[in-house]
């Protein structure tokens, strides 16, 4: 990013790269992680859950998190702002974010849930994560709170 002065950009768009590349870009621009910094609009190509976790664990709040389906794939369009409030989200919060707030949320949730059986194979039985995933797979209420 080529921004010379703080406040020069009110909104920054990061799209079409992985979640990890997105947060690495944010880390290289520390002025983004400051109160009053710009709003970030992100469309990660992969690992939506990981980006949500990173944002929350680094003091960002999701202002919006809208699921969009394009070319047979689901994407999450996220808007985040730095608040400084660090939080540790659950796996379920990271998986769905705030997507349930939108009409497309049910389709996105079904897509995310469809990936869980394979993911669950790599999670040791008896762990908190395993229990959380098992609840989601058993059809317990998940992100429709």
Show the residue positions of the predicted features.
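Class I S-adenosyl-L-methionine
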Residues: 8-14, 20-145
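Conserved small/polar residues in nucleotide/adenosyl-binding loops
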Residues: 1-5
């Amino acid at each position: 990013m080529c921004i010379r002065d703080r406040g020069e950009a009110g909104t920054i768009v990061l799209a079409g790269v992985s979640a990890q590349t997105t947060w690495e870009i944010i880390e290289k621009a520390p002025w983004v992680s400051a109160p009053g910094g710009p709003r970030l609009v992100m469309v990660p190509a992969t690992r939506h859950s990981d980006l949500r976790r990173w944002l929350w664990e680094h003091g960002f709040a999701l202002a919006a998190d809208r699921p969009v389906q394009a070319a047979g794939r689901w994407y999450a369009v996220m808007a985040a702002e730095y608040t400084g409030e660090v939080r540790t989200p659950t796996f379920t919060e990271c998986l769905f974010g705030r997507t349930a707030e939108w009409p497309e949320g049910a389709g996105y949730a079904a897509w995310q849930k469809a990936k869980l059986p394979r993911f669950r194979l790599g999670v040791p039985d008896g762990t908190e994560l395993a229990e959380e995933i098992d609840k989601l797979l058993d059809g317990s209420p998940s992100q429709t709170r």
